[in-house]
Amino acid sequence: MHPNVYIPEAFLEKIQTILPAHLNMEDFIASCQKPLRKSIRVNTLKISVEAFLERAEAKGWKLSPVPWCNTGFWIEADESVVPLGNTAEHMSGLFYIQEASSMMPVSALFMNDESYDAVLDTAAAPGSKTTQIAALMNNEGVLVANEYAASRVKVLHANIERCGVRNAALSNFDGRVFGGWLPEQFDAVLLDAPCSGEGTVRKDEDAMKNWTQSSVVEIADTQKDLIESAFHALKPGGVMVYSTCTLSTEENQQVCHHLKETFGDAVEFESLKDLFENAEAALTEEGFLHIFPQVYDCEGFFVARIRKLTAVEAPKVKKRMGKFPFSKASNKESAEIAKQLQNTMDIKVPEDSTVWIREKDVWLFPDALEPMIGELRFSRMGIKIAEAHKNGYRWQHQVATALATGDEKNAIELTIEEAREWYMGRDVRPQNIPADMKTGKGEVFVKYEGAIIGLGKWVSNRIKNGLPRELVRDKNLF
């Protein structure tokens, strides 16, 4: 795929000095020039792995399991007519296109089938790991998904929405603020740190065009600040995973050792030798995974699992929050909203969520978020479920993506032609209307092959399209 991939000579000389004895440079260079296998992760918030495998087989997709992620698969699929990203399964959130090695940090975070109430994803966009965490949390507790680059928060939200995540709170800060603003708040923290990207040449032949040793050192300084802040944000007894898609020891082992030197006995490295079969092929003496691309035929990657054994003194910070624009709904309001949602949409408000109001907008926040409200300014929290109007509530798209299952009484199955029309933003006139379904007025879920794809409104014998404009596609659909 990339026989002419650019690899600086100075970088190759550096790799020669850190390559483990059982590996060789010829294989390293050959693997960098080899095409990266495409991989996907099944989104178990929407579908079981077993049900997805049946759908994949029917489509002629060949899947082989990723050993470190029981929902991850390498995929061989004919994309000459329809790219994977334009398949109905992808658009309805049944799977996420995710590089196999990037599934490993989240698997390490949940290595022992842990259950966490509060998780921080420090550098979250575009959302592959965030949605993976949400699935392992089963949409319970709270997941704070932070992204420093404002331009990427929109993409992060789009992926969270598509995948049916409802326990997330999004923020847009430099990751270095969390230790001071939310000290010892999280049961688990993922720090997938910004890095020099030395492991990504199989995906991007120009990834190393601007590589210099001085830039590696500069990035490592930022990573040390980030890992300190992440450690401060972690509760005593909590677990942090530090990961990068780079190979240099300055950005990997040395960052972890910096944490140990800074906080001493409060830091414990936990071995990842049992994370998956043959993990020892990439294991360092500390128990980290330092993955060169030829070992598992994937991107270069680094993963460390770290436990915080004792509390540490939080940094002193000043912060100005401004007025919080939401108010908690009264018991009466909450009961009325829950009643109408049940009566009109056959949906129950989740027990671990609370209704909050901002002007006419109605939101559901995860209960586990409440201790953080007023401590950090979030750009988006939970899911928007309705807008209040004089005649009741107008339900929103996230009721379909995050709350509906497809088994609701007012969910109607579309044909493939109708589903294509729907994704192109057009109203549909369904051919197959169940005899017991009331038509003519009211809101209705639409689904395709059993998966919910949106929320519309009956207008006579047609369903008015309620797809948000940013989700409308115009061609090349399944």
Curated annotation (Swiss-Prot):
Q: Which UniProt keywords apply?
A: Cytoplasm, Methyltransferase, RNA-binding, rRNA processing, S-adenosyl-L-methionine, Transferase
Q: Which GO terms describe its biological process?
A: rRNA base methylation
Pfam family example for this protein?
YebU_pre-PUA_dom
Residue positions binding S-adenosyl-L-methionine: 123-129, 147, 174, 192
Matching entries from SUPFAM superfamilies are given as: S-adenosyl-L-methionine-dependent methyltransferases
Known catalysed reaction(s)? cytidine(1407) in 16S rRNA + S-adenosyl-L-methionine = 5-methylcytidine(1407) in 16S rRNA + S-adenosyl-L-homocysteine + H(+)
- What residues sit in the active site? 245 (nucleophile)
Q: Which InterPro entries match?
A: Methyltr_RsmF_N, MeTrfase_RsmB-F_NOP2_cat, MeTrfase_RsmB-F_NOP2_dom, Nol1_Nop2_Fmu_2, Nop2p, RCMT, rRNA_ssu_MeTfrase_F, RsmB/NOL1/NOP2-like_CS
Q: Does the keyword Methyltransferase apply?
A: yes
Subcellular location per the Swiss-Prot or TrEMBL entry:
Cytoplasm
Q: Which GO terms describe its molecular function?
A: RNA binding; rRNA (cytosine-C5-)-methyltransferase activity
**Keyword Lipid biosynthesis set for record:** no
**Enzyme Commission designation:** 2.1.1.178
| A GO cellular component entry from the record | cytoplasm
Q: What does this protein do?
A: Specifically methylates the cytosine at position 1407 (m5C1407) of 16S rRNA.
What family does the database annotate? Answer: Belongs to the class I-like SAM-binding methyltransferase superfamily. RsmB/NOP family.
Q: What is this protein called?
A: Ribosomal RNA small subunit methyltransferase F
Query: Mind giving the lineage of the organism this protein is from?
Result: Bacteria, Pseudomonadati, Pseudomonadota, Gammaproteobacteria, Vibrionales
Q: Which gene encodes it?
A: rsmF
